[in-house]
């Protein structure tokens, strides 16, 4: 299934993300300027702003829960999905290749709560509650690498289970030769790897377990 992703994030999501971003900037500014001499009403305002910041963060981390067919059956917060309860929730993976057949990998930030510092799929992220799979694919690709136009090819969906979570993974690939812009708080670096170089480094604690298992399946089935 091919679809040219040239749409933008729906206006409602754009507005909410912009509002959240601006609100958090204001909160951080107020906290850096806070002092003992500030009037009580100003301190109360800062406290309220900090409370709102926490609420925004919670709202931004609500995931859908699905059954094994992918049908949405409920919702849960990120912490609930990653605490070992094995609540099945959807994620997207995008594998990006260049004209040489090399595969782009991203090195996960040391700040990540799962598999910090390891090399991983080109793009990967959770589907937000109320969001469609292809909307999440576009959003995550824009957020992680700054890519706004690409043609994804659907490869497969499958269930991946680790010690702390259980995911319904929707896997895509695309070919892209442009520039990448990434948030260094989320990604340490990106690099194109040859397929042979990846094979040589499997099972060396360099890649995430999810990437390794997915890579081996895709190679074995000639999907990359």
Residue locations for each model-derived region?
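A short coil-to-beta-strand element that immediately follows conserved catalytic motifs
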Residues: 148-156
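Nudix hydrolase/Nudix homology domain
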Residues: 56-58, 129, 156, 163-224
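Conserved Nudix-box catalytic region and its N-terminal flanking loop in Nudix hydrolases
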Residues: 80-92, 98-139
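Acidic pyrophosphate-coordinating catalytic loop
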Residues: 82-87, 114, 157-169
């Amino acid at each position: 299934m091919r679809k040219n992703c040239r749409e933008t994030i729906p206006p409602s999501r754009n507005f909410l993300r912009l509002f959240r971003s601006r609100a958090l900037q204001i909160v951080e500014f107020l906290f850096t300027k806070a002092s003992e001499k500030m009037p009580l009403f100003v301190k109360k305002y800062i406290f309220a702003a900090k409370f709102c910041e926490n609420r925004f963060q919670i709202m931004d981390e609500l995931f859908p829960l699905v059954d094994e067919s992918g049908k949405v059956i409920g919702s849960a917060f990120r912490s609930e999905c990653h605490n070992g309860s094995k609540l099945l929730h959807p994620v997207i993976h995008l594998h990006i290749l260049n004209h040489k057949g090399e595969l782009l990998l991203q090195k996960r930030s040391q700040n990540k709560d799962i598999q910090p510092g390891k090399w991983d799929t080109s793009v990967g992220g959770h589907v937000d509650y109320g969001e469609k799979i292809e909307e999440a694919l576009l959003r995550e690709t824009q957020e992680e690498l700054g890519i706004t136009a690409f043609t994804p090819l659907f490869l497969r969906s499958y269930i991946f289970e680790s010690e702390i979570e259980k995911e319904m993974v929707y896997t895509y690939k695309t070919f892209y030769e442009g520039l990448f812009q990434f948030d260094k708080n989320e990604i340490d670096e990106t690099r194109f790897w040859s397929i042979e170089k990846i094979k040589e480094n499997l099972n060396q604690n360099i890649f995430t377990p999810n990437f390794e298992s997915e890579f081996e399946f895709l190679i074995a089935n000639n999907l990359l």
